[in-house]
Amino acid sequence: LGGDSITLKPEGTAPVCRAYIQHGMANLPQPVRLFYENPHFRYERPQAGRVRQHHQFGVEIIGDPSPQVDAEVIELGWTYLSSLGLQGLTLKINSIGDSECRPAYMELLGTYLAEHESSICEDHQKRYKTNPLRVLDCKKRSCLSVSAEAPSSVDHLCDACREHFEGLRSTLD
């Protein structure tokens, strides 16, 4: 590129948040509902199921932290996917908590993974110490079997996060 520097978006949430702040959307009636559909790019070693360029459609609702708003976004996604005629869809929801309860869960998960280090894939034998959640996202058979028995984040939520998660579940039911 002749020494020029270019920036490729890795995902859509950060640019939406930047636009929200830059354009004074905090002064609008809340919540503010925004969406995007753009190409995004990853800078990592290619692996099965993960390409460097991909299209991402996203919805962001800013200004209302309620579980009902989370349910609204999930229902929007479900309706969209269903309208495409997709069959056999399954919805799984989870929570990794907040800055209060997540560190304890991350420590617990890290300890669990250390005990099963020899059973996880080679890539994650190196990575789990810095980001144990990545092991739970790995599609390799060895990591899938370890992940299936890993401690559940939902079982380690603080009271506020548990209340939010249960509120989301009851809204979706």
Predicted regions and their residues:
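TRNA-recognition modules of translation machinery and tRNA-sensing kinases, especially anticodon-binding
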Residues: L1-D173
